[in-house]
């Protein structure tokens, strides 16, 4: 393809007084007589390549079909050189392409890539813009606000004041991508479980387990609750109630004895329970264990508030060496009985 006519021959042709359009027309007529009926395929291939619809590789594959004909390379190179010369002279791609004889376009198109439909749409847009700009500032602002897109998800108004404890979605302190719907259902089941103040009785093992599971999930413990946890809590609750009643009996021991002397059938009534809680309202509070109570008995009342637990007995409480073994045996026996 690179062999053939040189640039000097093209320049000599233009220096003889011939116009560039006349020279390129003669070359194209020679190419048409050479190719015959295949000239239309050649013109379509070159036009598509010049406007960017064909790549260089595709163009070369199409032109290889005409390479066997004599003088084809010379005429093809002459056409390319004249096109480049016109482009450099006019410095306008579109005007150079319009000099090609086979390049026919409609007069309504102002440029190479401008279609009639696009030009009509641009004219309609310019007309609408002229009408809008002729309006007042307030009207233009109203049109601008009307054309704004609305948010996809409207903002939710918090209804915390209207929600109940059961209706609210429970909050679990874990990331949302790890949230399981089973956890939410377990927490709701714990909320629905009846309270002891509502049933006026000790909770059963199943309802207590549901409440323990809900509280553990709210605090981030997602591993579940073991089977015997609710039974141990019920046993501790019964022991605590037993200690409260024992405390009430010790308070009203004298009153109960007087009733027994007057009436052999006398027992523990609601009035006695009310009297015991009136005398000592802190009877519901669990007492200190035996080991924590001992240091308070071993110190005087004028000591400081912050008292450390004595690991060993004070020196003034120690007996003589002769009776030390007997006292230690008695102390160990008392510890076993009190525990």
Curated annotation (Swiss-Prot):
GO CC annotations on file: nucleus; SAGA complex
InterPro entries attached to this UniProt entry: Hfi1/Tada1
Single Gene Ontology MF annotation: transcription coactivator activity
Key words, A-Z: Nucleus, Transcription, Transcription regulation
Gene Ontology biological process: regulation of transcription by RNA polymerase II; transcription initiation-coupled chromatin remodeling
UniProt-annotated location(s): Nucleus
Classification via Pfam families: SAGA-Tad1 (PF12767)
Presence of the UniProt keyword Nucleus in the record: yes
Record note on quaternary structure: Component of the 1.8 MDa SAGA (Spt-Ada-Gcn5 acetyltransferase) complex, which is composed of 19 subunits tra1, spt7, taf5, ngg1/ada3, sgf73, spt20, spt8, taf12, taf6, hfi1/ada1, ubp8, gcn5, ada2, spt3, sgf29, taf10, taf9, sgf11 and sus1.
Protein family according to the UniProt entry: Belongs to the HFI1 family.
Listed name of the protein: SAGA complex subunit Hfi1
Native organism: Schizosaccharomyces pombe (strain 972 / ATCC 24843)
């Amino acid at each position: 393809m690179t062999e053939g006519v040189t640039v000097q021959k093209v320049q000599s042709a233009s220096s003889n007084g011939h116009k560039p359009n006349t020279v390129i027309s003669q070359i194209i007529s020679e190419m048409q007589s050479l190719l015959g009926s295949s000239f239309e395929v050649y013109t379509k291939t070159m036009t598509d390549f010049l406007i960017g619809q064909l790549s260089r590789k595709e163009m070369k594959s199409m032109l290889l079909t005409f390479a066997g004909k004599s003088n084809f390379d010379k005429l093809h190179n002459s056409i390319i050189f004249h096109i480049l010369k016109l482009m450099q002279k006019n410095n306008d791609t579109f005007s150079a392409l319009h000099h090609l004889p086979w390049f026919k376009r409609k007069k309504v198109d102002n440029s190479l890539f401008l279609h009639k439909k696009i030009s009509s749409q641009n004219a309609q847009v310019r007309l609408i813009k002229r009408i809008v700009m002729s309006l007042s500032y307030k009207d233009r602002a109203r049109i601008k606000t009307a054309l704004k897109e609305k948010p996809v998800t409207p903002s939710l108004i918090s209804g915390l004041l209207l929600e109940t404890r059961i209706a609210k979605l429970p909050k679990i302190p874990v990331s949302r991508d790890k949230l399981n719907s089973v956890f939410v259902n377990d927490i709701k089941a714990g909320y629905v479980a009846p309270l002891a103040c509502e049933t006026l009785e000790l909770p059963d093992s199943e309802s207590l387990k549901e409440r323990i599971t809900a509280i553990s999930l709210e605090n981030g413990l997602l591993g579940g609750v073991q089977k015997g946890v609710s039974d141990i809590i019920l046993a501790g609750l019964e022991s605590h109630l037993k200690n409260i009643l024992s405390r009430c009996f010790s308070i009203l021991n004298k009153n109960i004895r007087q009733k027994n002397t007057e009436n052999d059938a006398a027992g523990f009534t609601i009035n006695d329970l009310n009297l015991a809680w009136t005398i000592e309202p802190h009877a519901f509070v669990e007492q200190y264990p035996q080991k924590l109570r001992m240091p308070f008995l071993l110190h005087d009342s004028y000591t400081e508030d912050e008292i450390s637990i004595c690991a060993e007995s004070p020196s003034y409480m120690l007996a003589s060496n002769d009776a030390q073994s007997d006292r230690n045996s008695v102390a160990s026996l008392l510890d076993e009985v009190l525990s």
